[in-house]
């Protein structure tokens, strides 16, 4: 098995994108949303690059992340993905990649309690 600490930021973000999206989709469905268009529209408030960049900025400002999580964020943010953001500038896109890397890292290290705590924190901030 590979050491998760050696996985590059883009791979962690790839994992984190799927994991965070799954938690958000579950949350929205459990709130009673069932129509695909409404689900997609609402999910965007949580999972878009702009939303994730805002959330990670708040996490850093409020010192929510551990030292290790900040390190993972920076690794994801600073990795050159060679892809272009669809609806965000480069800085926003990189910040959201860092956000997703943190989610991916927590999932890959099976730190689900911490992952779910951060997801809940994000939901509260978006719905606040």
From Swiss-Prot:
Coiled coil: none annotated. GO terms for cellular component: cytoplasm. It is found in: Cytoplasm. The active site is at 17. One of its GO terms (molecular function) is ribonuclease III activity. The keyword Nuclease applies. Its main location: cytoplasm. Belongs to the MrnC RNase family. This is Mini-ribonuclease 3. It comes from Streptococcus pneumoniae (strain ATCC BAA-255 / R6). The lineage of its organism: Bacteria, Bacillati, Bacillota, Bacilli, Lactobacillales.
């Amino acid at each position: 098995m590979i050491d998760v600490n050696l996985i590059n930021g883009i791979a962690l973000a790839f994992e984190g994108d799927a994991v965070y999206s799954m938690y958000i989709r579950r949350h929205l469905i459990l709130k009673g949303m069932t129509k695909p268009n409404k689900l997609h529209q609402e999910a965007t408030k949580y999972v878009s690059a702009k939303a994730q960049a805002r959330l990670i900025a708040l996490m850093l400002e409020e010192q929510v992340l551990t030292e290790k999580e900040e390190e993972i964020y920076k690794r994801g943010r600073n990795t050159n993905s060679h892809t272009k953001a669809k609806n965000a500038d480069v800085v926003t896109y990189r910040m959201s990649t860092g956000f997703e890397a943190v989610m991916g890292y927590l999932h890959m290290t099976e730190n689900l309690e911490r992952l779910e705590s951060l997801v809940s924190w994000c939901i509260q901030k978006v719905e606040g």
